[in-house]
């Protein structure tokens, strides 16, 4: 089963529809309705943390989900979800300059299972006012996170956990029409498994 955590974003419906077209075995829970201990009783194979408003530090339950499930369940954070994953592992967040609302950017990515079969650079939709701060560390965001995709200007568009190899964050929206290969990326993520 796929768990989609809905952070009250207007794009959540599009995300649920896109994922449901790939695999209809999914459950959608609002972030303020989640109890990590109850989630353990579900047969969760993948977790997707949706976009949403606000700052990632306001979503403590999502951080609890990431910390509990990341060692054995593939997790994909989208936009706010990406920032939640980054802050779970000590990356910092800063204001985006400029703010992006429905703009497409070229994304330059490293070779990774998440981007398998996706021709780089690819075009993706951006809707955000915050970004993960690169903090002059190159590809090493923190001791356990690395950058795997950026814009031409060097803004982080995707990160991945070094040890929990299927924990990813992406700043862009794969469910948007502006993201040319978004469905392929979601299929790639949903094909990942720890065993």
Curated annotation (Swiss-Prot):
Pathway(s) per entry: Amino-acid biosynthesis; L-tryptophan biosynthesis; L-tryptophan from chorismate: step 1/5
GO MF term list: anthranilate synthase activity
InterPro entries: Anth_synth/Amidotransfase, Class_I_gatase-like, GATASE, TrpG/PapA_dom
Catalytic activity: chorismate + L-glutamine = anthranilate + pyruvate + L-glutamate + H(+)
Glutamine amidotransferase type-1 domain: residues covered: 1-195
Cellular component, GO annotation: chloroplast; cytosol
Biological-process GO terms, alphabetical: L-tryptophan biosynthetic process
Positions bound to L-glutamine: 52-54, 83, 129-130
PROSITE patterns recorded: GATASE_TYPE_1
Subcellular location: Plastid, Chloroplast
EC supergroup of this enzyme: lyase
Active-site residues, Swiss-Prot/TrEMBL: 79 (nucleophile), 173, 175
Keyword Cytoplasm attached: no
The UniProt record lists the keyword Plastid: yes
Keywords for this protein: Amino-acid biosynthesis, Aromatic amino acid biosynthesis, Chloroplast, Glutamine amidotransferase, Lyase, Plastid, Tryptophan biosynthesis
Intrachain disulfide bonds: none
EC code: 4.1.3.27
CDD domains hit by this protein: GATase1_Anthranilate_Synthase
Additional comment: Component I catalyzes the formation of anthranilate using ammonia rather than glutamine, whereas component II provides glutamine amidotransferase activity.
Subunit structure: Tetramer of two components I and two components II.
Classification via PANTHER family: MULTIFUNCTIONAL TRYPTOPHAN BIOSYNTHESIS PROTEIN (PTHR43418:SF4), MULTIFUNCTIONAL TRYPTOPHAN BIOSYNTHESIS PROTEIN-RELATED (PTHR43418)
Protein's UniProt name: Anthranilate synthase component 2
Species in which this protein is naturally found: Cyanidium caldarium (Red alga)
């Amino acid at each position: 089963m796929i768990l989609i955590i809905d952070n009250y974003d207007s794009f959540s419906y599009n995300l649920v529809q896109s994922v449901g077209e790939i695999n209809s075995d999914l459950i959608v829970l609002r972030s303020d309705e989640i109890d990590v201990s109850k989630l353990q009783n579900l047969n969760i194979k993948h977790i997707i943390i949706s976009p949403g408003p606000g700052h990632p530090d306001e979503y403590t339950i999502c951080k609890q989900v990431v910390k509990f499930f990341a060692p054995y369940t593939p997790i994909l954070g989208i936009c706010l979800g990406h920032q939640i994953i980054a802050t779970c592992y000590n990356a910092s967040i800063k204001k985006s300059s400029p703010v992006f609302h429905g703009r497409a950017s070229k994304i330059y990515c490293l070779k990774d299972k998440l981007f398998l079969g996706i021709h780089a650079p690819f075009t993706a939709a951006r809707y955000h006012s915050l970004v993960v701060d690169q903090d002059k560390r190159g590809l090493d965001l923190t001791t356990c996170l690395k950058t795997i995709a950026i814009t031409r200007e060097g803004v982080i568009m995707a990160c991945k956990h070094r040890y929990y190899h299927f924990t990813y964050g992406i700043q862009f929206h794969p469910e948007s029409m502006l993201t040319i290969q978004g469905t392929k990326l979601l299929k790639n993520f949903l094909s990942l498994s720890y065993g």
